[in-house]
């Protein structure tokens, strides 16, 4: 999500310029913005490539001809710049890429639609002012997400961009390798593949050159062999999408190229259809499939087709079953379940997966829900489940989700769970950075989940914290009891009964101080309890329910309850006080 208010303001200005400059179709505005942003990033990436070649002691071979670079034409007069872009820059851009690359394929029908010379220069200056290369994170996907939010389509059909920190968490937990064949079967802007590539480069860059003088990462990949480097460029990454349209296919291909994948393999394909035949093709699948609900409504008698939930036509066979791909159950219409079947089909034996699913997949009681959970647990190895809070996909959706980590083949013995409560951002629509963040702990726990020393240290720390907080909890109960008594006494006491009021105020202040002392201890206890293991027998006994809330044991603070005897005594005393007040009133009137 784009959280920097200054960046938001600058993007708003670009949007307004394009809108008022004649691009009345919002998707046209986004596409033209994308082309210019891509050209700017290409210019910056040339500087990066030159620096990396120097670090590797290699010859520098320019990817972008000098006459095409941003700095060459943006300094021209507006009219000359527009003509230059039309006749030289954009034709080169359309032919950029290797034969067979998805970028070159999708650019063939692209048009440069900015016709106002002044608008071109104003937008270019505004893009330069974004200073994306100086950001401490890749904000390009955030920019697209923010622009798409203006169209109110970012969450259409349940499809919305996965936050970058969630993608990075999933990638780090699955640890992509240089020889992995990696796929995203519903790719959007290809964020998962970009992060997988960056992870491989980072883990194969010499530690002494990984960071520059400013502390920024330099993803050189100098430890990769030439064969590994060529494989990463030409074969490792494959993406599919059919929901986002041609503009997003171009954006996804540009995103891959900007991050160093010069031969993007991003294809327009409905991966749930019969046309998609991949089987045992990938070593790693990373994805966040769209949560559309039903693929198609009930078949109407006599009609060979029926509209799906998103308004598209879904092919039906003569018997009224969905015309789905190989080995996909024709009695299932929920896309989130079908994608899980598809992942299992496309993974090679031993292949790994990290996939985001809506919570309903974890506990749904339908036959189709139970069947896919049974298949993952009994016929494969379910490695882990990370339950995520409902605000992770704000502002586009408040749906609760989880990440499933499983491996094709083998069988499940026990399952690692983590019940995430904080992801480093507020869980409202603003999604502002906050201090509470479980992701570092998730990564640490995952990497050490089979380490007995780590488990012992964590258990010992939990025991220490419980011992430290126990007397505070006991004092808390005593204070609650005294506050309860003083509150009653203060309510029935004369107005000038100062000692009771002061005693009550003092105890309330002490309780607030106690809560402040307990808060960090309780927060650490809660975090230590968020990781736990569940056996296959437990899951099987609960109809393969994978909800963290079903198995996590949460210790609740002992509540304070006054005894019935004291409550009755106070009621009698209150009745007596009220009767006395009534007698006093009666004397006043008589």
Question: What are these regions, as identified by a protein language model?
Answer:
Residues 1-178, 264-273, 387-391, 413-421, ...:
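Non-catalytic, mostly N-terminal accessory regions of nucleic-acid modification and defense proteins
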Residues 2, 296-335, 359-368, 389-396, ...:
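Short, contiguous acidic/charged loop-to-helix segments that flank catalytic cores in large enzymes
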Residues 3, 10, 25-29, 119, ...:
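Helical mechanochemical/support elements of P-loop NTPase systems and associated helical scaffolds
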Residues 4, 137, 145, 243-250, ...:
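S-adenosylmethionine
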Residues 12, 230-234, 262-266, 317-322, ...:
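Short acidic (Asp/Glu) and glycine-rich catalytic loops that position anionic groups and cofactors
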Residues 29, 226, 232, 240-244, ...:
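Conserved Class I SAM-dependent methyltransferase catalytic core
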Residues 159-287, 291-303, 357-360, 368-379:
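Conserved S-adenosyl-L-methionine
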Residues 352-364, 383-437, 441-445, 453-460, ...:
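Substrate-binding/catalytic lobe of Class I Rossmann-like enzymes that use SAM or dcSAM, i.e.
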């Amino acid at each position: 999500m784009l959280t920097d208010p200054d960046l938001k303001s600058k993007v708003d200005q670009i949007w307004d310029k394009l809108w008022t400059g004649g691009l009345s179709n919002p998707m046209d505005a986004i596409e033209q913005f994308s082309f210019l942003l891509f050209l700017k990033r290409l210019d910056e990436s040339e500087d990066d490539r030159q620096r990396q070649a120097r670090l590797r002691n290699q010859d520098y071979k320019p990817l972008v001809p000098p006459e095409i670079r941003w700095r060459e034409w943006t300094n021209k007069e507006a009219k000359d710049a527009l003509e230059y872009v039309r006749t030289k820059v954009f034709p080169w851009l359309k032919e950029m890429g290797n034969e067979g690359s998805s970028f070159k394929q999708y650019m063939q029908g692209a048009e440069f639609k900015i016709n106002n010379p002044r608008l071109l220069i104003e937008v270019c200056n505004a893009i330069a002012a974004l200073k994306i290369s100086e950001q401490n994170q890749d904000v390009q996907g955030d920019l697209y997400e923010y622009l798409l939010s203006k169209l109110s389509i970012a969450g259409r059909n349940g499809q919305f961009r996965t936050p970058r920190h969630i993608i990075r968490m999933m990638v780090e937990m699955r640890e992509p390798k240089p020889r992995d064949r990696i796929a995203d079967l519903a790719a959007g802007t290809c964020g998962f593949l970009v992060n997988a590539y960056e992870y491989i480069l980072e883990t194969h860059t010499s530690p002494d050159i990984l960071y520059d003088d400013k502390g920024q990462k330099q993803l050189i990949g100098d430890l990769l062999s030439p064969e590994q480097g060529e494989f990463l460029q030409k074969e490792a990454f494959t993406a599919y999408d059919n929901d986002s349209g041609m503009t997003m296919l171009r954006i996804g291909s540009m995103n891959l190229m900007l991050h160093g994948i010069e031969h993007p393999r991003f294809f327009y394909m409905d991966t749930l259809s019969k046309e998609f035949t991949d089987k045992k093709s990938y070593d790693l699948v990373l994805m966040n499939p769209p949560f559309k609900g039903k693929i198609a409504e009930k078949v109407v008698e006599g009609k060979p087709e029926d509209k799906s939930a998103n308004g598209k036509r879904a092919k039906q066979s003569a018997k009224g079953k969905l015309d789905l791909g190989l080995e996909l159950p024709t009695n299932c219409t929920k896309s989130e379940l079908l994608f899980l079947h598809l992942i299992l089909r496309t993974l090679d034996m031993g292949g790994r997966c990290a996939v985001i699913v809506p919570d309903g997949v974890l506990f749904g009681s339908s036959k189709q829900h139970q069947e896919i959970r049974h298949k993952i647990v009994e016929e494969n190895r379910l490695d882990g489940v990370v339950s995520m809070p409902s605000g992770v996909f704000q502002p586009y959706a408040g749906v609760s989700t989880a990440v499933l980590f499983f491996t094709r083949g083998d069988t499940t013995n026990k399952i690692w769970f983590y019940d995430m409560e904080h992801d480093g951002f507020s869980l409202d629509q603003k999604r502002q950075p906050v201090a509470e963040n479980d992701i570092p702990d998730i990564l640490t726990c995952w990497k050490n989940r089979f380490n007995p020393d780590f488990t012992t240290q964590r258990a010992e720390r939990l025991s220490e914290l419980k011992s430290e907080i126990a007397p505070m909890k006991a004092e808390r109960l005593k204070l609650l009891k005294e506050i309860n008594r003083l509150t009653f006494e203060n309510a029935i006491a004369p107005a000038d009964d100062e000692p009771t009021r002061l005693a009550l105020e003092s105890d309330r202040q002490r309780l607030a101080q106690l809560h402040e002392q307990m808060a960090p201890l309780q927060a650490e206890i809660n975090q230590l309890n968020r990781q736990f293991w569940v056996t296959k027998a437990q899951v099987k006994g609960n109809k393969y329910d994978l909800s963290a809330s079903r198995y996590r044991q949460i210790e609740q603070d002992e509540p304070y309850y006054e005894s019935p005897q004291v409550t009755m005594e106070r009621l009698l005393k209150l009745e007596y006080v009220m009767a006395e007040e009534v007698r006093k009133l009666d004397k006043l009137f008589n």
